[in-house]
Amino acid sequence: MPIYKTDKKRDGLFLYTVRVNYTDKNGKAHGLTRTAVGAEAAKLLESQLTAEYKTGQITPAERMTVGELAAKYLAAKRTEVRRSTAEKTERILNRYVLPTMQKERLDRLNAQKLQDWKQSVTALALAPKTQKNIYGEFRTMLNFAVKMEHLPRNPLLTVGNFKDTDFTPPTDKLQYYTSDEFLRYKAAALADAETKGTLSEYAYYVFFCIAYYMGMRKGEINALRWSDINGGLLTVRRSVTQKVKGESAVETLPKNKTSYRTIEIPEPLMEILAEYKKRLAARDAYRDNYRVCGGGENGVLTDSNVDRHNRRYADMAGLKHIRVHDFRHSHASLLANEGINIQEIARRLGHAKIEMTWNTYAHLYPRESERSLSVLNKVK
């Protein structure tokens, strides 16, 4: 069972392929090839595959069930993606796919059975985006079965994805604060922090200022250390997830390769950070390796407390409530409305693909429509 080191990297570690060759009961030769990130993960995967082979857990395609496939798929995925990502996939499969499909044999999957499954999910009256996420996870798992030669093709592609029954204009979906609204929100947050007079309350004010001025993800802000700030530059090197089973908060790598980024800090935020640093130092609560908002080496602001403060600040400012992630939208929307190049916005957000940025914020470029009309009006 060989391990091969490739020349590709992910999150700074080399990718390895692990292969096991075996013969089924009919004498047909098969090969399973899986990928692991890093040498340690590759050795662990090799041990796992060896154990499965010796105990007969490697099941020929004609007898493998969806449940058995899910177990193998999740085991492989845990070696390739962040822990929180693997657990999200596991939750979706356990909740929406396996209850009705786990006993179905792969070789007996057909369009009717999969259409019945789709109808059962539709009956749950979930949001269209949630339905499509469920379909995507199931489709990816069956693609894995094709890759591992358990299926000749993916039968789910025949029935297709869920469709939107109603059309909602993008502007109705995207929630954000304008610059004027954020200034009201910011003033309310500062007033609340000053009234309570504690560093921990001031940290929430700083948290939302970073979210708006930098467009960073919630986990990236929680993982931010003072050593990540160098003059007018801030480098995103890590993230924190609070949705890992059995643990309150886990520091992880950023979401993707482009999430590693160095971005410029605007002057208003520089002043806020300088004042916060001054207050921390006055109480001997500042160290270079301390987290900016959570304090200490491993402190975090919990999701529930961040949400609670967010609602309070919005109420105090007389504003509609938006989600914490919508501060990231607010950052991008402000830049888009000012005509900033979409590629620059994608860079600041750390998007893996510029198409993601364009599809989300393209409608916020009103000046482009004015410019195009102006050009056409000259042709007369």
Protein language model features and the residues they cover:
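Basic, Lys/Arg- and aromatic-enriched nucleic-acid-binding interface segment
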Residues: 132, 147-153, 157-218, 222-224, ...
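Short, basic (Lys/Arg/His-rich) helix/loop patches that form interaction surfaces
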Residues: 124, 187-201, 214, 263, ...
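Catalytic-site neighborhood detector that most strongly recognizes the C-terminal catalytic loop/helix
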Residues: 238-240, 270, 349-374
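DNA/chromatin major-groove-contacting recognition/catalytic segments
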Residues: 117, 245-253, 338-340, 359, ...
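N-terminal core-binding DNA-recognition domain of tyrosine site-specific recombinases/integrases
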Residues: 38, 62, 74-155, 193-200, ...
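Conserved tyrosine-mediated DNA breakage-rejoining catalytic core shared by Y-recombinases
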Residues: 17-19, 160-161, 223-278
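N-terminal DNA-binding module of tyrosine recombinases/phage integrases
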Residues: 9-112, 278-287
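C-terminal secondary-structure termini that scaffold catalytic or DNA-interacting sites
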Residues: 187, 191-194, 242-245, 249-260, ...
